[in-house]
Amino acid sequence: MLRAVGLSDEDFEKPLIGIANTWTDSTPCNVHLRDLASAVRRGVIDAGGTPLEFNTIAVSDGITMGTSGMRTSLVSREIIADSIELMGLGYHFDGVIALSGCDKTIPGTVMALARLDRPSLMLYGGSIQPGTHAGRDITIQDVFEAVGACAAGRIDEEELLEIEKAACPGAGACGGQFTANTMATVFEAVGISPMGSGTVPATDLAKAEVARGCGRLVVDLVERNVTARQILTREALENGVAVAVATGGSTNAVLHLLAVAHEAGVRLTLDDFDRISAATPLLADMKPWGRFVAPDLHRAGGVALVARRLLEGGYLKGDMLTVTGQTLSGEVSDAEETAGQEVVRSAADPIKDRGGLMVLRGNLAPDGCVLKVAGHERMFHQGPARVFESEEDAMTAVQGGTIVPGDVVVIRGEGPRGGPGMREMLAVTAALAGSGLGSKVALLTDGRFSGATHGLMAGHVAPEAVEGGPIAALQDGDIVTFDLEERTVSVDMSPDEIKSRVMAWSPPSSLIPDGALSKYARLVSSAANGAVTI
């Protein structure tokens, strides 16, 4: 049958390379991947391989944000991994190269590569360029925050529309150190993506040559018989954690690296993230909390510069193998720094002495919750709970002006099982920021956050409410305390009272249609374990 698609006897003698594409024209993050796949194909042929391309799904977080469609986002990560794994097993590919763009396509593809354990690599499609409004660079983050600003009367609808029209000027993933760029930088540091390949922006003319080089490289991996799990070791994944926290990356990095570790047969826990973040300095001044976007990082020197700085400080393990055949130290030894760049600081002069993520525990999160600390200085917050059973209810309260300084916004029933799908709460967190409340309130949820979220916002609360987690015990007015020095989040309530309230709580009735979401709800594990399906 392969003759019928154009292959010859000569092609059958060559390594068969699967090109796993996540192209779609329904999001700018992936709209250009068809062209990149063509360049990859040329590279595979250059190196003496036979390419076979196939496609899988891509659900855009940005487009589904704040809607019921966001329930499908994290679910899509598992389906991406499953579908690539099945194609790899079914076609017996000798090697696989996966092309990714929007948030879940990046970890989903790498999870599949870990399962298959074939010679393989992941190529990220690159970041979008920033838009421009009123003489300043803007990103999709500005749009979501402008919604809150408009609701609060700080801008009018005409300016909101202008910001929305300007924020996304072309192909590529959201431009700050949000989830997509976080995971792309992480996987360069881990070694499953070639160093320097991901930060090249989507619309840069050099991207096609990067893709062609990756096509040649995957054939070389086959010839060297270097498989994914030889690269995805515990030490390499710890390097990825260090780069995530040193760049102020997304809390989603926790979910996704735990999931990749699971698929690679590596033990990685929330405690590892907390330990590494506490010991690793924050070096990169990146949005959503900082000044710069991914193309700025690329011009400054890229992930190689970040990794070199961390290696110089003793924060990375330099002898880890990468897909190029070099060690991490070898990859970054000649990293070039653009004179005068202000994006990446030295380890001796960091932005902060500790990295950008923190794990909190306590009687509201016995199995942990995750907080991004890169963008704020508050180490303590105590205030009354404002409890909501869904993101929509919380959004109504924010837009209605009923959330006041000091409040702790609690959104539950949004975990992996409870959602189902563990929606991102960016609509709410951005509305709080846009209305001027971002630095005056705190938020606690068993859902998760966009990489564009910043402020005292703790998510991934485990156990989640529908699993009997103590977050289900909270009622309006309960005093919730965040103590970041002690790494705790708690409520002043006895264990017996918490247990009694949890037993009395029942989630709001929601009809989950038979299909992917109900299947996911039955199979998904805790956020503390990466929300993988088992």
Short names for language-model regions:
Residues 1-25, 29-31, 36-57, 62-63, ...:
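Catalytic or ion-coupling anion/metal-binding cores of large enzyme and transporter domains
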Residues 44, 83-87:
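Glycine-rich, N-terminal phosphate-binding loop and its surrounding beta-alpha-beta segment
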Residues 73-82:
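Glycine-rich, highly charged phosphate/nucleotide-binding loops
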Residues 87-109, 121-124:
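A short, small-residue-rich loop immediately preceding and capping a beta-strand
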